[in-house]
Amino acid sequence: METSSTISIGSCLKEHQKIYKEWFNIADSDGDGRVSGNDATKFFAMSKLSRQELKQVWAVADSKRQGFLGLSEFITAMKLVSLAQEGHEITSDLLKGSIDMKSVELPVLEGLENVVSKQKVSKTNVDVEDNVVTKPQVTAKTPWFKSKSIIKPQVNVVTIVDGLKRLYTEKLKPLEVTYRFNDFASPVLTSSDFDAKPMVMLLGQYSTGKTTFIKHLLGCDYPGAHIGPEPTTDRFVVAMSGPDERTIPGNTMAVQADMPFNGLTSFGGAFLSKFECSQMPHPVLDQITLVDTPGVLSGEKQRMQRSYDFTGVISWFASKCDMILLLFDPHKLDISDEFKRVITSLRGNEDKIRVVLNKADQVDTQQLMRVYGALMWSLGKVLNTPEVVRVYIGSFNDKPINEVAVGPIGKELFEKEQNDLLADLMDVPKKACDRKINEFVKRARSAKINAYIMSHLKKEMPAMMGKSKAQQRLMDNLEEEFGKVQREFHLPAGDFPSVEHFREVLGGYNIDKFEKLKPKMIQAVDDMLGYDIPDLLKKFRNPYDN
């Protein structure tokens, strides 16, 4: 599976590689390894293409909407410029078409020789200045106890993700910490949460083909994979890119600052012992991270034997993932109580869910129609949404499709469905930046509602006597209190947290210790949503947009 729509340096002719790197360094005026919009407009202007053509070149090259071009994206842009100069229409399908991108000639850039010669002259002057020996200045040493603390300058915002990090630290995080959002909803975000690659989680009952699906996607086994008819995957396995093939225990993963799994420590050692990371070098894993989960059990007794909060872990991963695949087997369409709880825990992430009816070639066409109808009926009782969920039908493994059972029409259907699902997965890295913005805005709104609820409960507490009775009354009538908050601040009912979950967490706190409403904090988040984020998106949009 190819997930990248850009062209790597290794896919160019050797004589072109050095030239592209030289051009990239010229275009990258500040030397930060990124060609920003302003840099690109100056450099691309030498191609003499129209503004509309260059707008399309940028849109295709910056497929992930990062707001800048790295070396791979820059090479893609240069090849697209060359094709546009030859008269080709620039579309995203051009990279997937019949054109051999490796043999595309260098684009014609008028005036580039002058720019190269000027840069060489300036570099020579800098080297001469560096070779001049200057006498080092002696500065008076200040005792450490008299030195003033130095305020570090703010890091320049060079990507949309950098901007979101700054907005979170300056405006959203203070509100979350003040009103204990990390305890009631989601842990505090770290830098690694923003920088993480997009994730795809696979859910399903045992032996529905989750691990086999990942193997089929990668085209090979991955470390720690176990496949069989019995419940084989007994742990959460995160398959991600790494320099070599190895598995990393969950406790180690949870404490690594550069990994987005610090929040899993709240589920305790019992869960972390059932969590591991599988690393291997692979082009697919360079773009996305895959999360394999234990098979959902059918019996209540087996569920009670789990030593950790299974649905809580699923809910945590669901909030972090970009796509959730629910896998079903034609012979196991019944949705158990635990599976129902798991699907319910995905509340708020319905837009990420895709349903896969796997192993569909094990039944004939007539049975498949009945199975499909039964599956939709079962899902309709669990997924409380009026929209029809997307269902992919196929047999996602390395074996050839059983044409005897499904016939030639079924074979063609399965191939089209598989291509559609792979295309959906290919879009995940492209939409990752948009998804981060979407999740950030969703989180900000949830944090605001959490602050309104906490401050309202604080306001309902008596000043002196009867505090314990008042707290119990508020907890018993929590749904009614939510309604008061909704009416007072004109909030949508669908954005409020689960009453049962909130009541459960609230039982461990003293409401009287909560903070009163701080309008300045709320206003800061409103300004962030109304002004800062739109300005950030405007700054890193296509530089050729009017």
Swiss-Prot record:
Keyword Metal-binding: yes
Residues that hold Ca(2+) 1 according to the record: D28, D30, D32, R34, D39
Example of a GO biological process term: protein homooligomerization
Family, per entry: Belongs to the TRAFAC class dynamin-like GTPase superfamily. Dynamin/Fzo/YdjA family. EHD subfamily.
Primary location: membrane
Span(s) of short sequence motif Nuclear localization signal: 429-436
Gene Ontology MF terms: calcium ion binding; G protein activity; GTP binding
EC number: 3.6.5.2
Name of a matching Pfam family: Dynamin_N
PANTHER family, sorted: EH DOMAIN, EH DOMAIN-CONTAINING PROTEIN 2
Region (G1 motif): 204-211
Organism the protein comes from: Arabidopsis thaliana
Domain notes: The coiled coil domain (488-546) is required to inhibit endocytosis.
GO CC terms, sorted: cytoplasm; endosome membrane; intracellular membrane-bounded organelle; membrane; nucleus; plasma membrane; plasmodesma
Topology versus the membrane: Peripheral membrane protein
G3 motif: annotated segments: 292-295
Keyword entries, A-Z: Calcium, Cell membrane, Coiled coil, Cytoplasm, Endocytosis, Endosome, GTP-binding, Hydrolase, Membrane, Metal-binding, Nucleotide-binding, Nucleus, Repeat
Domain Dynamin-type G, chain residue ranges per copy: 194-430
InterPro entries, per the entry: DUF5600, Dynamin_N, EF-hand-dom_pair, EF_hand_dom, EH_dom, EHD_N, G_DYNAMIN_dom, P-loop_NTPase
Cross-referenced PROSITE patterns: EF_HAND_2 (PS50222), EH (PS50031), G_DYNAMIN_2 (PS51718)
Subcellular location: Endosome membrane; Cell membrane; Nucleus; Cytoplasm
Protein name: EH domain-containing protein 2
Residues that bind Ca(2+) 2: D62, E73
Residue positions binding GTP: 204-211, 292-296, 359, 395-398
